[in-house]
From Swiss-Prot:
<dbReference type="InterPro" id="IPR001986">
    <property type="entry name" value="Enolpyruvate_Tfrase_dom"/>
</dbReference>
<dbReference type="GO" id="GO:0009073">
    <property type="term" value="P:aromatic amino acid family biosynthetic process"/>
</dbReference>
<feature type="binding site">
    <location>
        <position position="197"/>
    </location>
    <ligand>
        <name>3-phosphoshikimate</name>
    </ligand>
</feature>
<dbReference type="Pfam" id="PF00275">
    <property type="entry name" value="EPSP_synthase"/>
</dbReference>
<feature type="binding site">
    <location>
        <position position="171"/>
    </location>
    <ligand>
        <name>phosphoenolpyruvate</name>
    </ligand>
</feature>
<feature type="binding site">
    <location>
        <position position="171"/>
    </location>
    <ligand>
        <name>3-phosphoshikimate</name>
    </ligand>
</feature>
<feature type="binding site">
    <location>
        <position position="170"/>
    </location>
    <ligand>
        <name>3-phosphoshikimate</name>
    </ligand>
</feature>
<feature type="active site" description="Proton acceptor">
    <location>
        <position position="313"/>
    </location>
</feature>
<keyword id="KW-0028">Amino-acid biosynthesis</keyword>
<dbReference type="InterPro" id="IPR013792">
    <property type="entry name" value="RNA3'P_cycl/enolpyr_Trfase_a/b"/>
</dbReference>
<dbReference type="GO" id="GO:0003866">
    <property type="term" value="F:3-phosphoshikimate 1-carboxyvinyltransferase activity"/>
</dbReference>
<dbReference type="GO" id="GO:0005737">
    <property type="term" value="C:cytoplasm"/>
</dbReference>
<feature type="binding site">
    <location>
        <position position="313"/>
    </location>
    <ligand>
        <name>3-phosphoshikimate</name>
    </ligand>
</feature>
<feature type="binding site">
    <location>
        <position position="386"/>
    </location>
    <ligand>
        <name>phosphoenolpyruvate</name>
    </ligand>
</feature>
<feature type="binding site">
    <location>
        <position position="411"/>
    </location>
    <ligand>
        <name>phosphoenolpyruvate</name>
    </ligand>
</feature>
<keyword id="KW-0808">Transferase</keyword>
<comment type="similarity">
    <text>Belongs to the EPSP synthase family.</text>
</comment>
Amino acid sequence: MESLTLQPIARVDGTINLPGSKSVSNRALLLAALAHGKTVLTNLLDSDDVRHMLNALAALGVSYTLSADRTRCEIIGNGGPLHAEGALELFLGNAGTAMRPLAAALCLGSNDIVLTGEPRMKERPIGHLVDALRLGGAKITYLEQENYPPLRLQGGFTGGNVEVDGSVSSQFLTALLMTAPLAPEDTVIRIKGDLVSKPYIDITLNLMKTFGVEIENQHYQQFVVKGGQSYQSPGTYLVEGDASSASYFLAAAAIKGGTVKVTGIGRNSMQGDIRFADVLEKMGATICWGDDYISCTRGELNAIDMDMNHIPDAAMTIATAALFAKGTTTLRNIYNWRVKETDRLFAMATELRKVGAEVEEGHDYIRITPPEKLNFAEIATYNDHRMAMCFSLVALSDTAVTILDPKCTAKTFPDYFEQLARISQPG
């Protein structure tokens, strides 16, 4: 297996221009495909997940052109639901941001489409979304294991009263929200359980509004969506920088700054993960906010005990930053780490122990006490981009670290390690 050894980093300083947000890129691509008119997306993320969405749209007959660096995309909207000519199978890798929204959108009208993916995708639950779509009339068949992909979709979603469990993934609600305006009838979506990752729903609602559709949000407990609507192209749309990707550089600055400035997001960003900066500030770093940037300057870091439900992806970065904080850090309400690219709670606990931390792994929390000195370790990444990027922070000590399968960062940030090296001074 390929590996990358990072030598100790003495200091980080500089500016990082963030790649486009994965969450925003794939939502914007789908809405542009469903819309009337031509949409030009700029600062689009070029990553595995986005390529899976683009390949699926091409297979569904959507016409688009990409710039040479794949960050500018012109899409000719379909002006309504997507249809396949005859039976079709779409392979979506391990891209939840493609699987979930397409599973809903392709239930409009009459289709016969199979959605499948990598082995890990077949372990990521989708039953709550399927249950909700079936309540709205969709015909969906599980082809292997009940409640998991692959799925066969045969259209039939017309709207009506549906309910969806919000406790596992907000992507199920996102998928329903983006699909419902194109259904023939009005849709009322009721949320069962506690809605996780609420800020990701705000991204969805914000993008739908950009494409001309507004819905009634009743305190995140119920959403009322008028049927028979259509999306309209906004013309040109700039994809924000990825706030989850920003977390690694901001944390690096908190640990071994200097000052690091990330551009492409700022105080008015629609992504909830910008709140990660507030957590670093609470730990002792100095944060400065602009309209188009966030900067972080080193501070003496102290442990925290916090509910991280609102920023589950960026919270992983706090788990490795905790290695450099004084005291024991507890991250709570993070059950949905278990249903991501890998079981992130198990993976994080296992690898933190390798570098010498004392770790308590709970059902939905993790407690981390750093060692006096970090151990050298080979870090398994579980084919999970965030594990690779989080554990790069170990090199901000006086200990090297080896990252196995470093190219798994291609899911969201193909040149992550080059960008980290650019702002790093060796120890």
